[in-house]
């Protein structure tokens, strides 16, 4: 999903204020939520997927998100806050890299107990 040019420009500028302003003007409430996910380090990059931690963990891949907002309300017509956060994180590098496959993550947790 391509971001609006003003959001891309703001993301590359390094200015949190400019990024927040661009996200808010372009996406409204969803832009505000996306900024919060980025600010609070809620975007995770696994070997296989990006995951955004909100009320639950939502998998984001190729313009698709597993969150109810995307699946029910938006039906793929507009990006949810999780997709926006991931696209900005790809530009800024503001995500935590986890050297594991997300699909195997529950197995990793079980082995540690």
UniProtKB/Swiss-Prot annotation:
GO terms for molecular function: zinc ion binding. It comes from the Archaea. Keywords: Metal-binding, Zinc, Zinc-finger. InterPro entries: Znf_SWIM (IPR007527). A zinc finger (SWIM-type) spans 49-91. Pfam families: SWIM. This is Uncharacterized protein AF_1109. The lineage of its organism: Archaea, Methanobacteriati, Methanobacteriota, Archaeoglobi, Archaeoglobales.
